[in-house]
Amino acid sequence: MKAMQAYDQTTQLKLKSKDAIIHFDEGLIGFSDFKDFVLMENDSLAPFRLLQSLESPQVGFLVLEPTALANNYYDLVPAREWESLGVTKKTKPLAFVIVVIGNTPQGSTGNFQAPLLVNYEKMVGKQIILTDSGLSVRQPLV
């Protein structure tokens, strides 16, 4: 099982403590059974990151901070959503969109309508749906 071996090696290298685990109480849309993830960085993937499930090596998502393409993205998230994660004015919130890489750069998209919100200080997150944002679940990245 080559995938499992790579998963184990990557997790051991990147996961230095339980403090690095982001807990999603409700899981992600379509993946409600998976609650604990680690956000992995790799220079060869930049500006993307990998959100890897700790419950299954087969569940991982390529993610991107939406501000790379939409400067005002954080303003689109209702304050109550940040507050539900314990984000305050002193806390730096993080948001990510799940990315799908297409056959060409023009075919690559991000789900800007259903971002992942993270309170990195408390290591908790949730996925929400922005119904009135005007953004798409398949927002072109290029």
Locate each region found by the language model.
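Short active-site loop/helix that positions an aromatic residue
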Residues: 79-89
